[in-house]
Amino acid sequence: MPHTLPALPYAYDALEPHIDAQTMEIHHTKHHQTYVNGLNAAIEGTEWAEWPVEKLVGAVKQLPESLRGAVTNHGGGHANHSLFWTVMSPQGGGEPHGQLAQAIASQLGGFDAFKEAFTKAALTRFGSGWAWLSVTPQKTLVVESSGNQDSPLMFGNTPIFGLDVWEHAYYLKYQNRRPEYIGAFYNVIDWAEVERRYLEALK
């Protein structure tokens, strides 16, 4: 069955004023759809066509050379955006609680230190890419960034939330003011969903 564009769990205008409706609609229906289409075109008729996108992206280095570029770019784009939509919510913001909050405190020096590190990762990613909070194979948290549509899955880590810092994610509202966009993102993070992903990654 071909990969499909996931429906958003909220309306395009639900994250206003932090992320505008026009950006959300274009980002979802145009950019993400393009990644889905590109991935399907690349793997159609192959033994990997039925693989979940996360498994496919995680195994990209084991794929034939002829497929690696498309799976990295289009598969990575599909996986990254599929996660991105779910870790935002109109009821988002604030700080994490529970086991995730405890892990951030013990492993990353607390929420303020985490926020500083994550903001730096997003700000200093030159050109297009992502900032991530991921879980390593050793089950520890790490703040990292990746270029283009590379995913932490390609390097053995499990992303539990990420911020898209491609210009298409913010330029209509924020133009070149990436720091302002990053600051706005903290107001829509769905920490309950991030913790759910954290606990899943620990299994």
From Swiss-Prot:
If you read the UniProt record, what top EC class would you report for this enzyme, in one word?
Answer: oxidoreductase
User: Per UniProt, what is one GO molecular function of this protein?
Assistant: metal ion binding
Reactions it catalyzes = 2 superoxide + 2 H(+) = H2O2 + O2
Cited PROSITE patterns: SOD_MN
Cofactor binding comment, as recorded: Binds 1 Mn(2+) ion per subunit.
- Residues annotated as binding Mn(2+) are H27, H81, D164, H168
Its GO CC terms are: cytoplasm
Is the keyword Metal-binding in the record?
Answer: yes
Its domain of life reads: Bacteria
**UniProt entry keywords in alphabetical sequence:** Manganese, Metal-binding, Oxidoreductase
**What EC numbers are recorded for this enzyme?**
1.15.1.1
Q: Name one Pfam family in it.
A: Sod_Fe_C
Q: Which cofactor(s) are needed, names only?
A: Mn(2+)
Describe, as the record does, how this protein assembles with itself and its partners.
Homodimer.
Q: Which family does it belong to?
A: Belongs to the iron/manganese superoxide dismutase family.
Query: What does this chain do?
Result: Destroys superoxide anion radicals which are normally produced within the cells and which are toxic to biological systems.
Which PANTHER family would you find in this protein's record?
Answer: 37S RIBOSOMAL PROTEIN S26, MITOCHONDRIAL, SMALL RIBOSOMAL SUBUNIT PROTEIN MS42
The entry's protein name is Superoxide dismutase [Mn]
Q: Which organism is it from?
A: Pseudomonas putida (Arthrobacter siderocapsulatus)
